[in-house]
């Protein structure tokens, strides 16, 4: 499979179906896109481009950038593309001349926690009740209520 990364332009359709896999709040997703840079991953097959993944980078401090949304279309999951997409986000972040990349995920996001640590991120903190404070609806994954945000960091 050949995959290409492109920056989302104003003319492009926003891939809400993917962005909402990682964050169920359209309002929060819109805020993230307006403040950050959104990148789409395309599967290029027979001249047809299919969006299979997405990530959003946001510079939060002069030397820090955060991956604030990242997702792979469900039918493409389990093929190593999540790890590949995290590495693509890291490479894009490096072009911003930052020293630190951050990412956060829910306490119930077991697979994502494993993935980010395999990509070199280290747990640096827990924002207790983050999802309770910022989301009206309760979120459950893997039979666990998502309450706390686990914060991870990668020094580059």
Residue ranges with predicted function:
Residues 3-75, 86-87, 155:
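Acetyl-CoA-dependent GNAT
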Residues 36-38, 146-151:
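Short hydrophobic/aromatic beta-strand or adjacent loop that forms the aromatic wall/cage
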Residues 73-75, 79, 108:
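Active-site acidic-Proline motif in GNAT/NAT acetyltransferases
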Residues 78-91, 118:
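Conserved acetyl-CoA-binding loop-helix of GNAT-fold acetyltransferases
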Residues 93-105:
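Conserved GNAT acetyl-CoA-binding A-motif
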Residues 103-113, 128-134:
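Conserved beta-strand-loop-alpha-helix junction that forms the acyl-donor binding cleft
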Residues 117-125:
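Conserved acetyl-CoA-binding loop of GNAT-fold acetyltransferases
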Residues 124-148:
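Short, flexible, glycine-rich and Lys/Arg-enriched loop motifs at helix boundaries
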